[in-house]
Structure formats: C-alpha cells, structure tokens
C-alpha cells in the first residue's frame, strides 16, 4: 500500500510514492538497476522485481476526443474531466529498449502474470517497451491475466473482464 500511495494534495499531488522512492534511490546510487536492488534490500522484498527498461520515458495517452495527455498521473484526471476514454497509450520517446535482465526473466519464467494493477498506467506501459511483448508471446511459461476486482476511475470506467483482456491483447499483439 505504501509504494502504491498517490499523494492527493500539495506539490506532490498525483505522484506515486513508489516512483518517488525509486527516483530517490536512483539519485543516491546513480544507477536505476542498483536502485531497484537496494529497494529489494530495504523493504526485504521476497521474489525479484525486474524493471523492463532503465530509459527515461513519458507515458502518453491519446483520448477518444483526439487530445494527447502526457504524464502517468495526468491521464486519469484528464479522462474524467474531458469525459473521453483512452483510445491508446504510447511512450515518448518511442523505440525504448528493454533491459536484457527483463527479457531473460520473461523467457525463463514458469508463469507470466499480467495484473492486477492500473491497466493503462502500470500494466500496458511495460508492453510498450520494445521486445517485451515479443518475449511474453514467445516465452514457454504459462501466461495469466489477473483482472482488478473493480474498475479504476479515469482508466477503465465501465470495463468488463472482456474489455480488460482485449486491451492487454491489443498491446501484446
């Protein structure tokens, strides 16, 4: 819950605690992958979290009304305010490359679990990194989609399980 906490007010409004924690560790250690390792140590995380890329990217969404929203925390607010659903999400810059460790982890996994989580601002962005969708499709491990128990305002309003799965399949290819 702590790492998923999103600030509601002040200068940090809309920011995710986990992202800030990793950003601070990256600044301290000067290396994103090392920061993730340190996060594992600090929080005594069981298992291993492997980032898909170390590149600096911005998540963008094209809404059904044609407007483009840049920035993960701005997307749900814009969708709700404009009453226009997400048409597609993409990364800027395009052509983002994956970390070899991410592709290796996917290829060696017994099971690949997509979800639960924010569909358009957490799950699908990983699929936008070059080579990740290909690795998931070609990996021998079982693929499992775990849908959220409820919709998320500004991302999956009125979505059914079929809509959720269709969105993931669209980006998996």
Q: What are the residue ranges of the model-derived segments?
A:
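A short helix->loop->beta-strand "cap" motif at the edges of active sites that frequently abuts
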Residues: 138-143
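Electropositive, gly/pro-rich neighborhoods at or near active sites that engage anionic ligands
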Residues: 1-83
């Amino acid at each position: 819950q702590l790492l998923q906490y999103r600030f509601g007010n002040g200068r940090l409004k809309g920011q995710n605690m986990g992202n800030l924690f990793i950003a601070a560790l990256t600044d301290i250690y000067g290396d994103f992958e090392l920061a993730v390792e340190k996060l594992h140590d600090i929080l005594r995380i069981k298992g291993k979290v492997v980032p898909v890329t170390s590149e600096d990217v911005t998540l963008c969404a094209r809404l059904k009304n044609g407007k483009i929203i840049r920035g993960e925390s701005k997307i749900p607010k814009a969708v709700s305010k404009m009453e226009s659903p997400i048409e597609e999400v993409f990364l800027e810059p395009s052509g983002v490359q994956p970390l070899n460790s991410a592709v290796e982890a996917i290829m060696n996994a017994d099971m690949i679990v997509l979800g639960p989580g924010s569909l358009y601002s957490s799950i699908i962005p990983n699929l936008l990194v070059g080579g990740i969708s290909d690795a998931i499709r070609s990996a021998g491990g079982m693929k499992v989609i775990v849908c959220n128990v409820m919709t998320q305002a500004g991302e999956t309003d009125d979505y059914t399980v079929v809509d959720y799965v269709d969105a993931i399949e669209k980006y998996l290819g």
